Amino acid sequence: MLTSTIDKRIKRLLGISVLLLIIGKGILHLTANLHFDIIFQSGLAFQKVNGIILLILAILPLINSSLLSKKYGLIIFYLASFIIFIKVYVGYANAGFLPEQIVECSIQVGIPITYIHVMRGDLNKRRLIFILQLLVSATFIGHAFYAIGYHIVPSNFLVLTTNSLQIDKGEAINFLYIIGWIDIICAVLIFIPKIRPYIIWYLIIWGFLTAIARTYAFVHESNETAFFINQVFETIYRLPHGLIPLLIWSITRQPTNFQLKNIFKAKPNKMSSEFS
C-alpha cells in the first residue's frame, strides 16, 4: 500500500515544476506581447508588472524556504496562480472564448496552489495523486480538443507540427487528429489504477516532447534572437506537462524510495496492491 506521507523527493519534483512554470511565465510577461490589451487598458504595462511580480514570487522561496511553511507561502503561490489565471483568461478571450483554451491550462493554474498545500501538509499521497491526475487529464483533454479540431486547429499547432516533423499541412492535420484522440483516451485511462502504469509513460514522453517542440520547431526557422529566446521560455513553462505525469509515476510505483538510477536496473518490481 502507498504510505500516506509525502516525502522530500515528491516535494522537490513538484517544487521544480512550480519554479519552471513561474519563471517561464514571468520572463514571457516581460519580453513578449501576450495581448493583455484585449482585456485591459495599458495592457502591455500591466503585463510587464505581472512579469516582475512573478519573478519576485519565484525568487522569494529560494532566498528563504521557511516562507513556504508560513501564511506567506499561501500568499506567494495563490498570487502566482491568480496572475497566471489572468494570462489564461486573456488567452481565453483572444481565442474567442473556446472552453478548451481554459481547460488546457489546468496544470499552469493548479500546480502552484497544489504545491503550497503539499508544503503545509494539507494533502496525503492519495489526495495528491487524484489532484495531479485531474490536472494532467484536463490539460491533455484541452490540447486534444484543439488537435482534433473540435472547434479549430490552432495555427501554432500546425506550424509546430510541420516544422518539427517536416511534413505538409494536410499530413499535420491528420497527425494531430490521431494524437488528439490518443490524448483523450489516455486522459481517461489515467484514473484506472490497473491501466495507469502502462499509459503514464505516453503522457510523460508526449508532455516533454510538446514542450520541447516549442523551441525545436524554430531552430532553423527563426532569424530573430529575441523570438527564439521567447520560444525557449515557452518550452520552460511547459516542462511541467511532462514533469507532473512523471511525478504521478514516481509516487505510485514501487519501491517507494525512488531514485532516477533505478529506472535502468533490470530488477523486476512487484506492483503495489493499489493496482491489484
What do these predicted ranges mean?
Residues 187:
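Conformational-control "hinges and anchors"
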